[in-house]
Amino acid sequence: MATITKNRSKLRQFGSAPYGNLSILTYQIKTNASGALLDSNSTAAIASGDKLDLGPLPEGMSLDEAIVTVSTAMTASVTGKLGFEYEDGVDSAEVPQDDDYFFAATTLAAAAILRKANTAAPVVLPKPARLILTTGGAANAKASQIDVRVIGELVGAR
């Protein structure tokens, strides 16, 4: 299983309002005709079991919701789980890493709008993390586009 890292997003990450700290962080998964993640460190097609590192989640962010828009579906039978891992690779006793914090075994092979399906209580990240999509079911062998929005409050480091 490979870990494929998406290059840093060139989109600006704003969202704070004068009366609160609500933020929406955006990430995009776009693949070419052979199924490889564009703008990443790999030219190989995304295989079942690959971890896609979509980008940073800041320390002190409350993870409240995720909205995933599958506008151009992946190959039939491709599924995914969406969660997070800490940048330093070391788990936290307070908030353990969770590879399916937002959802698990959800189809990415059909156009849809997906929401957080895990009923776990919102958590505040005690240290910097990475948003991770882990694929399953089948390899992707086609062009696709999936846009991910993580919604939460930037409450600050503890």
Predicted segments — roles?
Residues 2-158:
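Surface-exposed, low-hydrophobicity beta-strand/loop segments enriched in small/polar/acidic residues
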